[in-house]
Amino acid sequence: MKEEVSTSNQEDLVADQEVIASEESDLSPKEEKVSESTIDDDDSLNDAELQSNKQTLDNEARLEQLEKEHETLRSQYVRIAADFDNFRKRQSRDQDDLKLQLTCNTLSEILPVVDNFERARQQINPEGEEALTIHRNYQNLYKQLVDVLKKLGVAPMRVVGQSFDPTLHEALLREPSELMVEDMILEELVRGYHLNGRVLRHAQVKVSMGPGPKVDEEDKQIDEDSQADKRDEATTASNELD
C-alpha cells in the first residue's frame, strides 16, 4: 500500500515538473521577442535622432548661406541706389549749369546793345520838341530793356573808388593819380555786370598808380595828435578795468 502511494507521488511530481518546463519553454520565446523589439526600437530612435540632427545642421548651413546672399544683394542694392542718386544729382547740376551758360551767352550778346543805349544817352542833347519826344521814346525803350535784365537777375557793378580786383575787373589803363592811391579804380570804361551773384561781364576800368592825395604837414600833425589821444584814452580805460 505504501509503495503505491509513493509511486503516485512520484508521478505527480514528474507531472508538475513537466508543466513547469512547458510553461518556461512557452515564456522564453516571448521574452526574446520583447528584448529584440526593444533593441529595434532603440535603433530606430537613434536613426531618427541622427537624421533630425543632420537635417538641423543642413538647415542652419542653408540659412547661413541665404543670409550671406541676402547681405550681398542688399549691399549691391544700396550701392546701385547711391550711384543712381549721384547720377541724378549730377544730371540736375549739369542741366542747371547748361541753362546758366546759355543764359550768360544770350545776355552777353545783349549787353553791347545796352552799352550803345547808355553812350547815346550821354551824348545826345535833344533840341526842340520833336527831338525831345524821340529822346523820351528812346529812353522808355532803354528802361524796358533794363527792367527785363533786372528780372533775369542782371545787376550792374559799381566800381569807381573800389580796390582793383582781377576777378571782377579788367584794367585797360593805368595812370598816376593824386586823387586815389595805387590800385584804386579811377574810371569805369565799360560797365561790368553780375548775374545772380556770378560775374556776367568784367568791368573794364582805369586804375590809379598813385601816389594819392597829398597830406599837408599840419593835417598830418593833427592826425598824429588825434591818434595819440585815442591811444591815451584806450590806455586809461584799460587801467580802469584792471
Curated annotation (Swiss-Prot):
One of its GO terms (biological process) is protein folding. GO terms for molecular function: adenyl-nucleotide exchange factor activity; protein homodimerization activity; protein-folding chaperone binding; unfolded protein binding. Residues 1-57, 208-242 are annotated as: Disordered. Its main location: cytoplasm. NCBIfam families: PRK14143.1. Homodimer. Participates actively in the response to hyperosmotic and heat shock by preventing the aggregation of stress-denatured proteins, in association with DnaK and GrpE. It is the nucleotide exchange factor for DnaK and may function as a thermosensor. Unfolded proteins bind initially to DnaJ; upon interaction with the DnaJ-bound protein, DnaK hydrolyzes its bound ATP, resulting in the formation of a stable complex. GrpE releases ADP from DnaK; ATP binding to DnaK triggers the release of the substrate protein, thus completing the reaction cycle. This is Protein GrpE. It comes from Prochlorococcus marinus (strain SARG / CCMP1375 / SS120). The gene is grpE.
